[in-house]
Amino acid sequence: KGVAGMGKLYQSDLEMSLGNNVIVTQMTQAVNWARKYSFFIYPFITACCGMEFMSVAGPRYDLDRFGAAFPRFSPRQADLLMVVGTISHKQAPILVKVYNQMTEPKWVVAYGVCTVSGGFYDNYTTVMGIDTIIPVDLYIPGCPPRPEMVIDGLINLQQKVQEETLQDHVKGPSPVTSATRI
């Protein structure tokens, strides 16, 4: 619902705080169009799915044609976190720190069944899905996921980015500091 104020209609509190300083209608669509074709990936690779991820990122499948090319080596330069492989409880605070260091807007992809749900590692050391510690935008299941699934997932993420509003861009730091087992 919009808030009427002084003859103008504002879509959210965030847009109301911006006032007349920022145009948020057509400009948001143009910025989203540019963002969906320019992902800066930070790969957080911990297990065997990493080999398949390297295959997908290589020249045969060429993620560059979808705007997800050269990986960044600092989370401060990235806006797409690819979490690939099993996450242990000791790695969970590191993953949260990496997520919090990323620039806004940021997106997270859970790559592989171990990242999505813990996989076949149902024990006390494994995080049962990274969505218990950081927000996830896209799940790509599989052991390991087929390259076609990764490309399809990336196309779905591009569609999600295109439809985002200004309010969706501000996610903030992860409120969860440690992994909890469900």
Name each model feature, range by range.
Residues 78, 83-96:
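Thiamine diphosphate
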Residues 83-85, 111, 142:
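Short His-Asn-centered micro-motif
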Residues 94-109:
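A short, gly/pro- and small-residue-rich
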Residues 53-54, 89, 116:
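Short, acidic Gly/Pro/Ser/Thr-rich loop/turn segments
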Residues 114-118, 147:
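Short gly/pro/ser/thr-enriched loop/turn and capping motifs at secondary-structure boundaries
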Residues 1-76, 102-106, 124-126, 132-139, ...:
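Iron-sulfur (Fe-S) cluster-binding modules
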Residues 121:
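Short glycine/threonine-rich loop/turn motifs
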Residues 80, 110-115:
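Hydrophobic cores of alpha-helical transmembrane segments in multi-pass integral membrane proteins
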